[in-house]
């Protein structure tokens, strides 16, 4: 769904953003069908974190780029000046990731500033709208590398 509406997501009220994200999560089962690729695109993983405050499982669909045996994601929040909640939840427990219907525990590391240009180029190839997100926000968008445990 972000492929269809992602360019304006920064203007949405928080409740709409959460609703669309929820629908997107439920549509992940269609990821490998023609319809699924049109609506949600390929290169989407499902990140599962534990909420820092709620202690509940939080699922977030994210666009990723492959790099060696890892997955690169951006904490872009559609170019918002606010950092997404899932990013803050990473510090609590190791996250789980589902990619191509395979779920696994993952570790993560923040990508250093000196490496960001290279990894942004990988992400931009997958989803060119990331370029707009970087222009739209005043914050330095964190890039995260997830690897299997």
Where are these regions (language model features)?
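Compositionally biased, charge-rich terminal segments
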Residues: 1-15
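Short, conserved active-site entrance elements at the starts or edges of catalytic domains
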Residues: 12-51, 57
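Short secondary-structure transition/capping segments
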Residues: 12-18, 124, 144-149
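Short beta-strand segments
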Residues: 42-78
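Short beta-strand micro-motifs in enzyme catalytic cores
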Residues: 45, 140-144
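Short, structured beta-strand-loop surface elements
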Residues: 77-130, 136-140, 148-149
């Amino acid at each position: 769904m972000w492929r269809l509406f992602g360019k304006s997501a920064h203007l949405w009220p928080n409740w709409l953003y959460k609703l669309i994200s929820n629908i997107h999560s439920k549509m992940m089962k269609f990821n490998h069908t023609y319809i699924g690729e049109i609506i949600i695109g390929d290169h989407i993983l499902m990140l599962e974190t534990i909420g820092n405050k709620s202690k509940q499982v939080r699922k977030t669909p994210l666009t990723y780029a492959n790099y060696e045996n890892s997955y690169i994601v951006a904490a872009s929040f559609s170019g918002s000046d606010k950092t997404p909640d899932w990013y803050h939840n990473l510090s609590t427990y190791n996250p789980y990731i589902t990619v191509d219907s395979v779920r696994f525990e993952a570790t993560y590391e923040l990508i250093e500033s000196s490496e960001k240009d290279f990894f942004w180029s990988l992400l931009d190839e997958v989803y060119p709208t990331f370029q707009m997100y970087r222009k739209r926000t005043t914050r330095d968008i964190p890039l995260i590398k997830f690897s299997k445990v």
